[in-house]
């Protein structure tokens, strides 16, 4: 007898759903933290979703370091961006394999690379503008799509999972990002801030999207019905992750909720699958308060497990 989640004839979604349904609601909720515990009965080790690969595998030992993103963009060379992505994910996979042999599942050892940064660099005062490909939505789209394709590869499994960030309209000033409300016209959204994300989803099949800290037209990015609706419209079928501790900002700095369970519920119901931070520790409290359903938790868990299955983490080879 083979468990359904082990059946490679099934789609990644079907396998993820089958695995999720072997878990209790409490266990499903635990998988939504960025530092997810092991699922021992399935042979799935613990996993830390947080890894960086903007211009090289970051913070995890020796790796090739390419020029910063803004400098790579200055070459106007999309084929080069593909090759850069290929090198980064090959090294990330090698580091992951090496760490896994020793049971090391710490931060910066995983296959979910939170890159590229495809925000539009409009204001030179933004201290992280060098992480972007500049001010041009078209150039950002072309370079970003090729970087994602290089990262993810074209094999049966993803070599690594790229992540389009920060969705959306995130471009400083850095000191205001936790309470800032970006007021943007529909025209500017469609012409400036969304094209690169749309291209990475539709053309690049990017596996991850990260929500930003700021609000957009009053809605927090990690719980924005408008932004999540765009992802559904484009056919996104990966995982959505919050920027780190962004959901906590809902009740601490944006002041749009009163409590951590309310913030967790707002993000989860909108479609945020994985929480970088600790607010999703309050998911079960939100369930007890009637703010979310068990199905909300199950849906997010399936999305998270689907990505890990696409990375080959459930299969011996």
Annotate each PLM feature.
Residues 1-317:
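Glycoside hydrolase catalytic-domain context in secreted enzymes
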């Amino acid at each position: 007898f083979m468990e359904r989640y082990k059946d490679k004839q099934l789609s990644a979604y079907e396998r993820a759903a089958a695995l999720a349904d072997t878990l209790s609601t409490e266990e499903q909720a635990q998988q939504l933290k960025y530092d997810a515990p092991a699922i021992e009965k399935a042979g799935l080790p613990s996993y830390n979703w947080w890894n960086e690969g903007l211009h090289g595998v970051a913070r995890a030992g020796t790796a090739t370091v390419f020029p910063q993103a803004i400098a790579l963009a200055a070459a106007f060379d999309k084929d080069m961006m593909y090759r850069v992505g290929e090198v980064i994910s090959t090294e990330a996979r090698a580091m992951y394999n090496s760490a896994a042999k020793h049971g090391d599942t710490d931060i910066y050892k995983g296959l979910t690379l939170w890159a590229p940064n495809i925000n539009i660099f409009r204001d030179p005062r933004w201290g992280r503008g060098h992480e972007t490909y500049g001010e041009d939505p078209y150039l950002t789209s072309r370079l970003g799509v090729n970087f994602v394709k290089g990262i993810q590869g074209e094999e049966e499994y993803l070599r690594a999972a790229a992540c389009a960030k920060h969705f959306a309209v995130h471009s400083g000033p850095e000191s205001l990002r936790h309470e800032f409300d970006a007021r943007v016209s529909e025209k500017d959204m469609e012409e400036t801030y969304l094209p690169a994300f749309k291209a990475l989803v539709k053309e690049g099949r990017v596996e991850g999207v990260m929500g930003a800290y700021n609000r957009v037209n009053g809605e927090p990015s990690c719980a924005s019905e408008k932004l999540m609706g765009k992802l559904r419209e484009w056919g996104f079928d990966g995982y959505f992750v919050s920027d780190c501790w962004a959901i906590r900002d809902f009740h601490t700095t944006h002041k749009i909720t009163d409590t951590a369970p309310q913030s967790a519920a707002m993000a989860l119901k909108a479609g945020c699958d994985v929480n970088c931070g600790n607010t999703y520790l309050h998911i079960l409290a939100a369930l007890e308060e009637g703010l979310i359903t068990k199905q909300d938790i199950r849906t997010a868990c399936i999305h998270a497990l689907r990505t890990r299955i696409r990375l080959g983490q459930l299969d011996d080879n």
